[in-house]
Regions:
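A conserved mid-protein helix/loop that constitutes part of the nucleotide-sugar donor-binding site
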Residues: 1-9, 31
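Nucleotide-activated donor-binding/catalytic signature segment of Leloir-type glycosyltransferases, i.e.
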Residues: 30-51
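Short alpha-helical donor nucleotide-sugar binding micro-motif in glycosyltransferases
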Residues: 47-48, 55-60, 144
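Aromatic "clamp/platform" in nucleotide-sugar-dependent glycosyltransferases that forms part
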Residues: 68
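Short hydrophobic beta-strand element within catalytic cores of glycosyltransferases
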Residues: 81, 85-88
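Conserved acidic donor-binding segment of nucleotide-sugar-dependent glycosyltransferases
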Residues: 102-110, 118-122
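A charged, aromatic-enriched C-terminal amphipathic alpha-helix characteristic of glycosyltransferases
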Residues: 122-152
Length: 152
C-alpha cells in the first residue's frame, strides 16, 4: 500500500506502476490493496514467470521492494540480474544484499520512498538490452568447430 500511495502522490502521467505477484489467499488486506491499486490505475499482473516476467523486467524503469518482512529476496536478486535500478526497504534481508546506500529507504517511510521514486524517474532511462547475436546456434556451432580445429 505504501508503494501505491507513494507512486500516486507523484502524479506521473507518463509512467505506470506494475505490481507482479499475488497472495496465496485472499484476506481483508489483499482486498484493500487491490481496491487501492484499481483506484490509482495500478496494473496488477498476478503471478508471472518465464517470458512474461522477462518482458516485464526488460521494459521496467526500476524495481521496488518495499517489504516490511522478507526472507531471501529472490525477486530483488532477479531484478538485479537484469541490471535494473532498485529501491528497497532497509529490512535486514535486503541489507544483506549489500546495495549502495541510496538504494534503501526507511521501512514504512512513504515520503522517503516517494523521493527515491521521483529521483529515479527524472534520470535518463537506459533500457536493458541483451545482445543475443552471440548466442545463436550457428555461431555457437562455429565456435565449437573452431575449438576442435585448434586442437589438432
Amino acid at each position: 500500500h505504501q508503494l501505491i500511495r507513494a507512486f500516486a502522490a507523484l502524479k506521473q502521467q507518463n509512467y505506470k506502476l506494475v505490481l507482479a505477484g499475488d497472495t496465496d489467499f485472499e484476506d481483508d488486506y489483499s482486498k484493500k490493496l487491490k481496491s487501492l491499486a484499481k483506484e490509482n490505475g495500478v496494473i496488477l499482473t498476478g503471478f508471472i514467470k518465464g517470458t512474461k516476467l522477462h518482458e516485464l523486467l526488460t521494459h521496467a524503469r526500476c524495481f521496488v521492494l518495499p517489504s516490511s518482512h522478507e526472507g531471501l529476496p529472490i525477486a530483488l536478486l532477479e531484478a538485479m540480474s537484469y541490471d535494473l535500478p532498485v529501491i528497497v526497504s532497509n529490512i535486514p534481508a535486503n541489507l544483506e544484499v549489500g546495495l549502495a546506500f541510496d538504494c534503501y529507504f526507511q521501512t514504512g517511510n512513504e515520503k522517503q520512498l516517494q523521493e527515491k521514486l521521483q529521483k529515479n524517474l527524472v534520470q535518463d532511462f537506459c533500457s536493458v538490452h541483451y545482445f543475443m547475436d552471440e548466442y545463436n546456434w550457428d555461431r555457437i556451432a562455429e565456435q565449437v568447430v573452431s575449438v576442435y580445429r585448434n586442437m589438432f
